[in-house]
Structures are given as C-alpha cells and as structure tokens.
Amino acid sequence: MAGNTFGQLFTVTTFGESHGAGLGCIIDGCPPGLELSEADIQFDLDRRKPGTSRHVTQRREADQVEILSGVFEGKTTGTPIALLIRNTDQRSKDYGNIATSFRPGHADYTYWHKYGTRDYRGGGRSSARETAARVAAGAVAKKWLKEKFGTEITAYVTQVGEKEIRFEGCEHISQNPFFAANHSQIAELENYMDSVRKSLDSVGAKLHIEAANVPVGLGEPVFDRLDAEIAYAMMGINAVKGVEIGAGFDSVTQRGSEHGDELTPQGFLSNHSGGILGGISTGQDIRVNIAIKPTSSIATPRRSIDINGNPIELATHGRHDPCVGLRSAPIAEAMLALVLIDHALRHRAQNADVQVNTPDITLSNK
C-alpha cells in the first residue's frame, strides 16, 4: 500500500517531486472555523526553504504557498484543504550522471528495486524537498493547537558533527543560520561548516524538539501510544536515524529511583519521561531528540554500481546541504504538531465527556 498519507482524523496526503512542477498536500479533517491565511503557513515555509545561507543548498525556491480549497472568507470550512507550492529553480542537468547509477546512501537503489523505475532528478519523491508540504500542513496544525490549548512547539539544533552546541536561550534560534539556541558559538560553527564544505564532505546533526502546554490525556494505548506515534513521525523525516523521548538512551544508566518522575500536589518533580507515561501525555512538556545522518550527496568520489551491476565510481554534483539537519527544525516541529492535533481530535472523539476529581497537577506550574 502507498504510504503518502499521515494521521487518522487529521490526515495529510502529500504529493510532488523535487524537480516536478510543484508539490503540496491535501489536509482532511481540519476543524472548521480556524482563521487561516497563506501568511500563517508562509512563516514556517520561509524558515525551511533553501538558499537562506551559505551553509545550506543554494537552490533558490520562494516556496510560496497557495491555498486552493478548504478556506472561505478567511476561515477553514471543514472540507479538504489543498495547499500547493510550485517549483521554480530546478536544475535537472546536474543529475544526468546518475540516471543509470545509484548514489551511496540515497534511496536510488531501493526505489529502483521497489518500483522498477525512478525519477532520478534530485531524488524525485525521496528528496527532502517533499518536506515543504509537511511544513505547510504542520503550520495549520500548530495554529489550531495554539488557539485551542496554547501549545507552543520549538525545535533547535544541539549538535552539528562533533560540535556540541550549548543551550543559551530560545530567543537565539531565529537569529542564526543554524537554528541554534546559542549566541556565543555561532562564529565557531560558521568556520566549522565552511571547512566541511571545502572538504567536499558532509556532517550530521542532533535536534531537540519540545512542545509546551500539551493537555493531559493524549495518546491511544496500546498500539497508538503517543510516544510511539511521535517516534514514527520523526523517523519518517528524511535522514533521521534515531529518536529519543525524555531521558531516552540515558535511561539505561539511571536508577529507578532517579528516572521515575515523582508527583506532588504542586506538580511533577522531574520530566525524565518526556511528558508521556503509558503512552499518554502527562501535561508536562513533551521532549524529543532526533539524530540526522550526514547528507549523502557529496562531491567526494565513492564506489557504487550502475543499473546493470557494474562497478563505478560516483561523485554527486549539484546544489546540496553539507548538513541537512540545519533545515530540519521546522520539519520536526511540523511532524510533532501533526501527531498532537491528530491525537487531540481522537481524544475528543472518544473521551470528551470524561471527568475525574484528581486535579491536573501540571496546571499548578503554568
């Protein structure tokens, strides 16, 4: 079965390829009455778009979104919302040398074996360019979540290659090309990325994603646990190779007396769970880390094969990110938002009338 649709009640189906006429998505299940304009969506697309600094791909795309349906007189109608982003700066000639060969680390080999054909221009459907449609859909989800619950979703880069980035404040994220919550290390990171590009190589990255003001109760045990759905969503982002929620892999070295978040009438005393217990949100901040592999498109020659199985040496030419993780923060935010809105609607559908006498202790800290 095709895997182009995400979600159950708030569904997003994306379409398009890297070098096609355009790409976009169909959102179905968005509640009616949400004030929505193209400007609401454009803000996050501008954060993700290419060509914004020398440290990312120099492909120049405006990524201007068009709302084709589902919005009338400035508000959502409850009918499918169609969003379109046209491609304007394709340079397909850069990919002629891979029409009959497979780039190491890319989906070329697997797409060829699965479908028997592939759009080799910029990776086609497997390109990270497809994530522009996810960011557009995520912007809609983020706006609804903020208006409904006050939910705020923030992502930032915590490591680039071997360079760990100290947290100095979220106010710095929008002020540098690295989506870093840091000011003092930016010059160091600039020099580091310049050296990576000059070496004709690439590096990976680590990101932290956090959602504040998430209501208690989201998640559908046992198979659609909130943490399971978040991990699924994050692993669906191009180049993501690892996901941690809460303490993550550090949980291995913790004792139970440390890891278990104690409760008091004034709130939880820690958040090693990452805001999720038993697959259900606790009302605390949801905390996620993701690891992103080095960009596979590099100009350094590497061994591969052609479609006939013959050995070749291949160097990838064109415009590529030396660290694809640098533009991943808006994508990760979008995917977390899509999970949360879907589960908020699912929770409302089944449990809207549930009432308990126990107070929501997370509210005392807000």
Curated annotation (Swiss-Prot):
Gene3D superfamilies: Chorismate synthase AroC (3.60.150.10)
Gene Ontology cellular component annotations, sorted alphabetically: cytosol
Cofactor, free-text remark: Reduced FMN (FMNH(2)).
Key words of the record: Amino-acid biosynthesis, Aromatic amino acid biosynthesis, FAD, Flavoprotein, FMN, Lyase, NADP
Known pathway: Metabolic intermediate biosynthesis; chorismate biosynthesis; chorismate from D-erythrose 4-phosphate and phosphoenolpyruvate: step 7/7
Enzyme class: lyase
Family: Belongs to the chorismate synthase family.
PANTHER family: CHORISMATE SYNTHASE
The name this protein goes by in its record: Chorismate synthase
Organism: Neisseria meningitidis serogroup B (strain ATCC BAA-335 / MC58)
